[in-house]
Each structure stands twice: as structure tokens, then as C-alpha cells.
From Swiss-Prot:
Pfam families: UBA_8. The gene is UBALD1. Residues 139-151 have a biased composition (Pro residues). Gene3D superfamilies: DNA helicase RuvA subunit, C-terminal domain (1.10.8.10). Residues 112-138 have a biased composition (Low complexity). Belongs to the UBALD family. This is UBA-like domain-containing protein 1. Residues 89-177 are annotated as: Disordered. It comes from the Eukaryota. It comes from Homo sapiens. Residues 167-177 have a biased composition (Basic and acidic residues).
Amino acid sequence: MSVNMDELKHQVMINQFVLTAGCAADQAKQLLQAAHWQFETALSAFFQETNIPYSHHHHQMMCTPANTPATPPNFPDALTMFSRLKASESFHSGGSGSPMAATATSPPPHFPHAATSSSAASSWPTAASPPGGPQHHQPQPPLWTPTPPSPASDWPPLAPQQATSEPRAHPAMEAER
């Protein structure tokens, strides 16, 4: 009865190994026998393709998993597929691709004006605050007075707060002059 029990245990281990590793039953049996029926050792040998102390050099080739998703694709084929995916993505998903391209290209026309208004308002006082700390509003108007002719049409729609800060800056500049 002990021999049958060991045989049953071995058969259960083989079935479990086949389910876990995804290999054939004869491969599982050979690996388990070579690993002295130690499941983890046989499984590790199967996935790492390490040599078991017994010489099975020609057998190791047959023990490599054939149905695992980790099989690497052919590199040139993968590059071709990626290039096709990129090209088809831009053409097929034109509805979703063009808004992404539009958002990628449209902010630069808006960002330079927003950058000149908001970043200039935030960067010029910090750059000009060391020469005149109490004259915080004085450096802004001289820098803004040359620029309003070009973006003057964009300023009221973009930021009404900038328009309200502009009149405050001009009286402060004129009062200090």
C-alpha cells in the first residue's frame, strides 16, 4: 500500500506540475524525478532552465516551456509591428488622435501669452525685487508698457485680473515718477 501511495503522490505532483508549468506530463515527471520529487526545485529548474546535477543536456532543450507568454518576439518583427501601430494609431484614431495633437499644438499659441502675462508677472517682480524691494509695482509697468501693443488684444479675453492689475500698476508708476 505504501508503494501505491507514493505512486499516487507522484502522479498528483506530476499533474500539479503540468498545471503550474504548462508542460507535458513526461517532462514534468522527468524534472520531478531529477529533482528527487521536490516540487519547487523541479519548478525552478524548469523555468530557469538550469542544469540538474544529472547530465540531461539534450533533454534540457525539450524542457523549455513552449506555451508561455514570456517567449520573446522576433526583434525586427516587433519593430515593424510598433511602427505600424504608431502609423495606424495616428490614422485610425483620427478623432482621438487629432484632439491630442491639437492640445499638443494649441497651447503654445495660448501659452506664450499666458506665459508672458502670468510668468512675467511672477518672474519679473522676483527678478526686479532685489533692486527695489518697496518698489514692487514699479518694475512691472516699464516691462509691460513695451509689450501691450502686440498682445494687447489678447489680454482682456485671457485674464481680466491682468487687466485690473494693469491700471493699478500704471498709477503706481506715475505716482512714483
